[in-house]
Amino acid sequence: MSLRNLLQENSLNFQDIFYKDCEVFVELLQKWGKVHNLSGRLSDDDIYENILDSLYPLNFIDEFSSFADIGTGAGYPGLILAIARKDVKSYLIEPRVKRVAFLNFVKASLGLNNLTILQKRAENVEGLEVDLITSRAVTNTNLLLNITSKIKKEYTSYLFYKGSMLEDEIETSKISNYKVVSRCERNYLYIKGKKC
């Protein structure tokens, strides 16, 4: 199935330039991934599924004008969100050199002027405040909330791409004002920033 069809089946519609950019991303990830071990799953279908996984929450989260993705790795979800939402100021926070080199190469190849890549650990980032903080498969929810405390604004929302241990993490984190949306094996935890 084509990427366009896969996304459209999930109520995600984008202009042609997005799909062209994704073709470049797929090609670059497949080339770099084999050499630098960026991702274990490099078939077109696997990458398309990861792109869908990255974008699916756009169906249910609130609008945002900036976001920071913690531990972007090979580009999921942050780089994909930056490609899809060029109107949004995007920050990818990734400490590993090889992954940062790949992310910078994709940024340059696609001319992503909305994107800033920070080679740091999240807890060491200062002087940045965003509307939305995302993370996929980095660590537990409680630790994510703690290590991102310096980059959140008063009303920052969180979007964490989680697996099966989510109920325990929610209880441990003592969060409120959240919703969980499930798709296949994925649980998306959306913690809405509070407005008083």
What residues fall within each predicted segment?
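Conserved active-site region of classical short-chain dehydrogenase/reductase
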Residues: 55, 79, 142
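S-adenosylmethionine
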Residues: 88-91, 95-196
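Conserved SAM-binding loop of SAM-dependent methyltransferases across substrates and taxa
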Residues: 74-87
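Class I SAM-dependent transferase core
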Residues: 1-64, 68, 98-115
